[in-house]
């Protein structure tokens, strides 16, 4: 709890220039980065496509959060990029178990994302197999949403199904709530606008990381 929580910058854009700029900024200080990819069907808008990413830089863990209605359409590009973790949504139109199987055979960790209206107990078969569960508490395809901290109640339900699973949070994380999220025993806090908007991104990242290490209300 707290000291085990990592802050992960997220990149969400449909502009390749912005993608490159944010990538350059974040790899200078972050140990792990999440790239959000959207198909324009599961989400209201599209992101830069996986095919536009020639390769992922070495020395940093990359997570791909694929917001797509048909995960199988994106699997070949994910396997080509070989990220640390690939996250697909439980609400997709396809069974994720064959996708997870192919990811694991390729040495890629498998993650399942859960929208706010999805009860974790209904996707037990995915949680039992996945390496990572992403509690999505924002608006699909957008950064800067207000965090719904009540979604963190899903942590204990997920842990009751698979105690050792890594749990991530995506949606509205900022300096005012990362301590609370860390104290809910969220392992990974993905941060969008609270890092992309400040001019000094490294300082913002360090402040978030320090806050996430604190325990309780006053410490």
Where are these regions (language model features)?
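Active-site pocket-lining/capping segments in soluble small-molecule metabolic enzymes
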Residues: 113, 134
């Amino acid at each position: 709890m707290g000291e085990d929580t990592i802050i992960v910058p997220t990149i969400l854009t449909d502009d390749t220039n912005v993608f490159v700029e944010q990538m350059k900024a974040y790899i200078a200080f972050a140990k792990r980065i999440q790239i959000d990819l959207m198909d324009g069907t599961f989400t209201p808008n599209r992101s830069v496509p996986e095919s536009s990413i020639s390769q992922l830089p070495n020395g940093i863990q990359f997570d791909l959060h694929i917001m797509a209605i048909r995960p199988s359409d994106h699997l070949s590009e994910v396997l080509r990029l070989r990220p640390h973790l690939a996250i697909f949504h439980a609400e997709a139109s396809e069974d994720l178990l064959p996708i997870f199987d192919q990811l694991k055979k390729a040495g890629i960790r498998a993650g399942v994302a859960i929208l706010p209206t999805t009860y974790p107990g209904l996707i037990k078969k995915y949680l039992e197999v996945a390496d990572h569960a992403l509690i999505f508490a924002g608006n699909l395809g957008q950064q800067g949403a207000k965090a719904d901290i009540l979604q963190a109640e899903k942590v204990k339900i997920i842990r009751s199904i698979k105690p050792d699973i890594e749990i991530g949070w995506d949606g509205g994380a900022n300096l005012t709530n990362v301590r609370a999220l860390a104290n809910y025993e969220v392992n990974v806090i993905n941060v969008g606008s609270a890092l992309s908007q400040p001019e000094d991104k490294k300082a913002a990242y360090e402040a978030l990381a320090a806050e996430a290490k604190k325990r309780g209300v006053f410490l």
